[in-house]
Amino acid sequence: VVAILGSSGSGKSTFLRSLIDLETVDGGSIAIAGENLCKDGVYVSKKEKAKALSKAGMVFQHFNLFPHMSIRKNLMCAPLLNKQGTKEEISKLAESTLAKVGLLDKIDAMPSTLSGGQKQRVAIARALMRNPEIILFDEPTSALDPELTGEVLSVMSDLAKEGITMLIVTHEIGFAAQVADKIMFMDKGYVIDYGTPEDVIINPKNERIKTFLEKVK
């Protein structure tokens, strides 16, 4: 688990979006689970790109659920399009995946009936449906009321315990210190520190990071 920290506008979300082709890069190389997305600033073919992107799941800040579909259909939509199995198999997968985030009783509900925390847990389940090698989280709790944040962080903590690889952009410093194996700190578009939570945020040596942590306490 890698947590990406930094002030607003430091490039965290842009970096994350670049990894799944939602932003275009003009230099460098990106590979997901050994599959190239771009090399030396040149993107691979459409087919190779699809193969690389199939290795990653994404959880956005604002849930992005289809409002006119039930939770079951929201989870089944992409797997059906990608022919991951029969309709019955994918429906059962939706049930087991939703149970993992504690929302099996909401499987036939509509998104409008769910709280923000529940919607984000559904979004996490949707990302898990693809059985990805890595899940990217773009500030998954920033759109939630403080009292709803805990339920989402709890699900993410459980995923970390299962050994699921995650790259998390977050402002939840305490959560990052507890769950992350590594912390990446960004400032003005650059990575200015990378290491264990102990080295980067518990006993920081970088003055910029010290200033940041003092302001968010």
Language model features by range: what are they?
Residues 20:
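Helix-to-loop junction immediately C-terminal to a conserved catalytic motif
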Residues 129-133:
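A short, proline-enriched helix->beta-strand linker immediately N-terminal to the Walker B motif
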Residues 110-114, 118:
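Conserved ABC ATPase signature
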Residues 194-195:
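ABC ATPase "signature
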Residues 135-138:
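Catalytic Walker B motif of ABC-type/P-loop ATPase nucleotide-binding domains
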Residues 69-77:
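Short coil-to-helix segment of the ABC ATPase nucleotide-binding domain corresponding to the Q-loop/switch region
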